[in-house]
């Protein structure tokens, strides 16, 4: 059976890891063992934070909507309840964008929500 020399394969594998570790600090960028650990950990962080990003943006949208509706005398929860009663099917991303960039349009939405709410539910604490 012929002898298999694996130098090219191993070198290619090492170079792929070192290319992924480009820009890292210290021995993490040029020592294969440490670079492999750093690249693996970076992948774990990337996977985790792709999930966290969705939660973070939703929280940001809620904060922006809450700030905008409190200026109009409502709370976030009452506003969302009023949206449902008014039959407006807008998600938080769109509402936050309207609140930040299109205040006139958001004001019209708030007026519709206030008219759809029962009388006792209009007061912000």
UniProtKB/Swiss-Prot annotation:
One Gene Ontology BP term is: ribosomal large subunit assembly
What are the protein's UniProt keywords? Answer: Ribonucleoprotein, Ribosomal protein, RNA-binding, rRNA-binding
Q: What is any Pfam family matched here?
A: Ribosomal_L20
Is Nucleus found in the keyword set? no
**Source organism's superkingdom?**
Bacteria
Keyword rRNA-binding assigned to the entry: answer is yes
Q: Which SUPFAM superfamilies match?
A: Ribosomal protein L20
Which PROSITE patterns does this UniProt record tie to the protein?
Answer: RIBOSOMAL_L20
Concerning Gene3D superfamilies, the annotation shows:
6.10.160.10, Ribosomal protein L20
One MF term from GO for this chain?
structural constituent of ribosome
Please tell me one Gene Ontology term that the record gives under cellular component: ribonucleoprotein complex
Family from the record: Belongs to the bacterial ribosomal protein bL20 family.
Q: What does this chain do?
A: Binds directly to 23S ribosomal RNA and is necessary for the in vitro assembly process of the 50S ribosomal subunit. It is not involved in the protein synthesizing functions of that subunit.
What name does UniProt use for this protein? Large ribosomal subunit protein bL20
Q: Which gene encodes it?
A: rplT
């Amino acid at each position: 059976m012929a002898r298999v020399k694996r130098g090219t394969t191993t070198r290619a594998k090492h170079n792929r890891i070192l290319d992924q570790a480009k820009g890292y600090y210290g021995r993490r960028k040029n020592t294969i063992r440490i670079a492999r650990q750093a690249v693996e950990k970076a992948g774990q962080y990337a996977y985790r934070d792709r999930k966290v990003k969705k939660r973070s943006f939703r929280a940001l949208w809620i904060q922006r909507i809450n700030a905008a509706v409190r200026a109009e005398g409502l709370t976030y929860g009452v506003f969302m309840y009023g949206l449902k009663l008014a039959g407006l099917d807008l998600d938080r991303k769109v509402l936050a964008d309207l609140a930040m960039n299109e205040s006139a349009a958001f004001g019209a939405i708030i007026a519709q929500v206030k008219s759809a709410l029962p009388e006792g539910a209009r007061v912000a604490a």
